[in-house]
Regions:
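Gly/Pro-rich active-site loop or hairpin
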Residues: 7, 18-19, 40-56, 128, ...
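Glycine-/proline-rich flexible loop or hinge segments
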Residues: 45-52, 80-88
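Active-site acidic/histidine proton-transfer and metal-coordination neighborhood
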Residues: 17, 62-75, 84-195, 202-205, ...
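Active-site loop signature of alpha/beta-hydrolase-fold enzymes
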Residues: 35-38, 84, 159, 200, ...
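Catalytic domains of carbohydrate-active enzymes, especially glycoside hydrolases
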Residues: 16-38, 108-113
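Hydrophobic faces of well-ordered beta-strands that scaffold small-molecule active sites
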Residues: 3-7, 28-32, 76-81, 115-117, ...
Length: 231
């Protein structure tokens, strides 16, 4: 396992500045933010250190991205884009899906082979209805990932932290029972988990047991400290 960080915390930095910092601080890898150029709807979104669309269109730019990573001695562990591709807003949904596909193609072109994201959630629907929506929205995305030989790692964050994320949150894949259902629907070796145990702690879920049951599905890991104040 290699230690790195998600680059969305360095909003306003260039790709080169971010890579230089990672190298100087001794990080082995980075999960590189690849949001489209747009106004951020929430904290840590809207950050882009790699322009995925440009990667797919500009061979010289793509070569520079990889050459600079090699020069810095820092591996790109994944391309990161965490939208809600199952939002009830069809215009936003379609835009998010298209950009996610661009990120998948860019991951292939750069030789990264990993994209980290959310499964999404329609906040107007219950869990069962959202599972039906997974059947509608995700198969073409997974098919593209398979064709590109890119793994998709879904983070287990509920995305339930603000008024705009209520009710239900914006990410369906938040508990092991739902993981089982989604993996039945999307039976692919290219779909797995970006495992973040901190989200299980505040949901009062065992964060060790899933490591054994889903050991073959854990593609990437987020690790952060957390403390529950019960008062």
């Amino acid at each position: 396992m290699k230690l790195g960080f998600i680059t969305s915390i360095l909003d306003g930095w260039t790709y080169e500045q971010m890579m230089d910092f990672a190298s100087e601080q001794g990080f082995e890898c980075v999960e590189v933010a690849c949001w489209p150029e747009e106004k951020a709807e929430r904290r840590y979104a809207g950050v882009s250190h790699i322009d995925a669309e440009r990667v797919n269109q500009d061979d010289e730019y793509a070569a520079h991205i990889m050459a600079y990573a090699e020069k810095a001695g820092v591996e790109i562990s994944a391309l990161a884009y965490y939208p809600n591709v199952m939002t009830a807003d069809k215009e936003k949904r379609n835009a998010a899906i298209e950009h996610l596909k661009n990120v998948i193609r860019a991951s292939k072109k750069l030789g990264v082979g990993m994209v980290t994201t959310f499964i999404g959630r329609d906040q107007t629907k219950n869990v069962r209805e959202n599972l039906e929506l997974v059947k509608e929205i995700w198969p073409p995305i997974i098919k593209l990932a398979e064709v590109c030989d890119v793994k998709i790692a879904i983070e287990n964050c509920p995305m339930l932290f603000g008024e705009e994320q209520w009710p239900g949150g914006q990410n369906l894949m938040t508990t092991p029972p739902i993981w089982r259902e989604v993996f039945k629907i999307l039976d692919s070796d290219n779909l797995g988990i970006n495992y973040d145990p901190s989200h299980f702690i505040w949901q009062m879920i065992d964060y060790i047991r899933p490591l054994y049951e889903f050991k073959d599905k854990i593609f990437h890991v987020h690790y952060k400290d957390i403390k529950i104040y019960k008062d």
